[in-house]
Amino acid sequence: MKKVGIIGVESKHAEFFGKLINVDKAYPGFFVEAIAPIDKADRLPYVLERCPIKKICDSAEELIDSCDCVLLITRLPQTHYALAMKCLDAGKPVFVDKPFTASVGEAKELLEVSLKKGLTLLGGSSLCFDPSIKLNLAQIKSSPLTHFKFTADPESPFGGYAFYLSHLTDLCTSIYGETHLVSASRKGNSISSLVRHASGIALLSTSLEPHECEIIYEQQGKSSLLTLSDTNCYQNGLNAFFAAVNGAPSSNEYLSQSVALIGEITNFFLNQ
């Protein structure tokens, strides 16, 4: 039985992940052993009501020492680099919630260390692990124009536009690899970013209107729609992480590419 540790409780992902593992028993080989409420301790009772966790740690270091792998779910990406590096330095696989890091340099360094140590490092938006993407990957990758759409608040209190934009940049780079901004526009709270990748163009559109994430792509001259579940995404993310911890192959290069694309888009509007 592998012991899982959760760092952070401010995000609802704490109880979502904890419930899947400890209550629903979706992963027989894993159990949440400890949680470290280092970001918003007053939310801990709410989390524990929904997923019982025996060990409460006062620090990330204490949690890392007591667990075999870590779910790092503090909200702000500015906290992710140092905490994820502590996990890797201790030889522990780690899942880093989105947005992955605050800078490209931080992302690349984490990826390099994980590769050097042979440790699993996954994370970002769990929408990327939706099985329907893999089933339709060839068609999506061959589409000359792909449209990614999701809800995002440009003025999010959790770091602004980048917080929710990361869902779409993670999806785009996980499918197409390195991408670069061509142009962007904003009308009220709706933002569209046109980006170029090696085989075509992608459009990333966000608005305040609540809706499930959509990927619209061309297939044999017709538009096809792929809707990604935002209820199953948490389980999909854990499926990928725990499979990788158990030895399944995984890729994570897209995470630094996504951080770079976030920077291009947010800087575009800052410089206007």
What residues fall within each predicted segment?
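A general structural signal for well-ordered alpha-helical segments in protein cores
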Residues: 14, 44, 80, 107, ...
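Rossmann-like dinucleotide-binding domain that binds NAD(P)(H)
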Residues: 36, 148-210, 260
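Short beta->alpha connector loops
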Residues: 11, 75-78, 100-101, 127-129, ...
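C-terminal helix-rich "cap/oligomerization" subdomain common to oxidoreductases
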Residues: 46-52, 62, 66, 70-72, ...
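Beta-loop-alpha module in the N-terminal Rossmann-like domain of NAD(P)-dependent dehydrogenases
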Residues: 46, 51-111
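A contiguous active-site-proximal alpha/beta segment in oxidoreductase catalytic domains
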Residues: 101-158
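N-terminal Rossmann-like dinucleotide-binding module
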Residues: 1-51, 141, 242, 253, ...
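NAD(P)-dinucleotide binding in Rossmann-like oxidoreductases
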Residues: 186-245, 249-256
